[in-house]
């Protein structure tokens, strides 16, 4: 179809921003914009038809919104209106000069009636989008596991680089976000971990009391685990002495009294040490301790009181010894009501149940 119709190239010199060609071919509707070449000039090639050899092809240019005729073409004035025109001879002259090559865009647009020629440029501009690369630094709290964005940096990529290729290079982000992500640990959690570790190595017993719960005595102070170790060792000594006495079959009164004093001294030393651990700044009077022993409902304490009374009725001389023994037994704190069973449970035990020192005392009284 294009080869059968004669073609003509319309031109306009550089200078304007936009030019539209209109004429009898589109009923003067201004539907054919001209193409701007690299030099800045405008041109367009389209097929033209003539009804007869003497007929004319009328056209006009719309330059930046103004309807203007061109001085390079013939001008026809009709009722004061100037229009350009060409004849069949002009088409033949241009063909002989070899300048009647058809621009594909213009031919297509002439057939489609008002298809904009600037559409390819608009698509080209739309493809040239700016690309950015986001670098994030994620801070992780070791205690709670919470992750937060510590810093974020946005870098514009050149046109040659592709954002998807950059993401593939860095691999999958740990936070599931696009861009490059760096994860750092929370320094606060690390410092706390380093501070706790040497404390646990130097104080293993404090760790044991923490896990099982704190033990409070009647005075409201926390008992340490060392006091329990001392008292358990005293009970073991009493059991060993009891076994030795049973092997001997009951010795003289002087030997039993000496054993009683020895066991009493052995019990005094750990109890005094345990008292230092419990409340070293306070010294409890003996009178208050004896009254506390009488008021408690623990059976071993009541037994001590009855035995000391029988001892005082039979022999009046050793009253001081009875008070001393009663004070020693009363220093052991009774188990307060409502407290849970704790690692220092052995503190509440009384060796009188096993028949230790007080069994020997009963033999002396007989």
Swiss-Prot record:
GO molecular function, one term: protein kinase binding
Main subcellular localisation: membrane
The organism of origin for this protein: Saccharomyces cerevisiae (strain RM11-1a)
Cross-link (Glycyl lysine isopeptide (Lys-Gly) (interchain with G-Cter in ubiquitin)): 314
Pfam families, sorted: AMPK1_CBM
GO biological process: signal transduction
Record-given protein name: Signal transduction protein MDG1
Feature: compositional bias, Basic and acidic residues: 265-284
Highest taxon in the source lineage: Eukaryota
Positions bearing Phosphoserine: 160, 288
């Amino acid at each position: 179809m294009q080869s059968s119709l004669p073609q003509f190239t319309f031109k306009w010199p550089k200078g304007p921003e936009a030019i539209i060609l209109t004429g009898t071919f589109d009923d003067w509707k201004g539907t054919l914009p001209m193409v701007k070449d690299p030099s800045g000039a405008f041109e367009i090639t389209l097929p033209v038809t003539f009804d007869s050899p003497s007929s004319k092809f009328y056209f006009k240019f719309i330059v930046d919104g103004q309807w203007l005729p061109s001085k390079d073409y013939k001008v026809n004035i009709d009722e004061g209106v100037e229009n350009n025109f060409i004849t069949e001879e002009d088409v033949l002259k241009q063909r002989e000069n070899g300048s009647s090559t058809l621009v594909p865009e213009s031919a297509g647009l002439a057939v489609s009636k008002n298809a904009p020629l600037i559409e390819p440029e608009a698509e080209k501009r739309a493809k040239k989008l700016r690309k950015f690369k986001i670098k994030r630094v994620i801070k992780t709290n070791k205690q709670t596991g919470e992750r937060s964005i510590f810093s974020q940096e946005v870098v514009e990529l050149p046109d040659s680089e592709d954002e998807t290729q950059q993401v593939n290079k860095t691999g999958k982000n740990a936070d599931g976000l696009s861009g490059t992500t760096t994860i750092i640990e929370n320094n606060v959690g690390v410092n706390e971990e380093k501070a706790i570790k040497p404390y646990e190595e130097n104080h293993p017993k404090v760790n044991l009391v923490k896990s099982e719960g704190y033990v409070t005595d009647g005075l409201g102070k926390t008992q340490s685990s060392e006091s329990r170790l001392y008292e358990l060792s005293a009970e073991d000594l009493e059991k060993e002495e009891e076994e030795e006495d049973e092997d001997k079959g009951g010795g003289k009164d002087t030997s039993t009294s000496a054993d009683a004093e020895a066991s009493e001294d052995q019990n005094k030393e750990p109890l005094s040490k345990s008292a230092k651990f419990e409340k070293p700044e306070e010294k409890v009077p003996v009178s208050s301790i004896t009254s506390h022993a009488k008021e408690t409902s623990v059976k071993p304490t009541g037994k001590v009181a009855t035995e000391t009374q029988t001892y005082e009725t039979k022999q009046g001389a050793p009253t001081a010894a009875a008070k001393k023994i009663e004070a020693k037994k009363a220093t052991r704190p009774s188990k307060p009501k409502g407290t849970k069973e704790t690692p220092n449970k052995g503190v509440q035990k009384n060796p009188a149940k096993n028949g230790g020192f007080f069994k020997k005392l009963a033999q002396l009284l007989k």
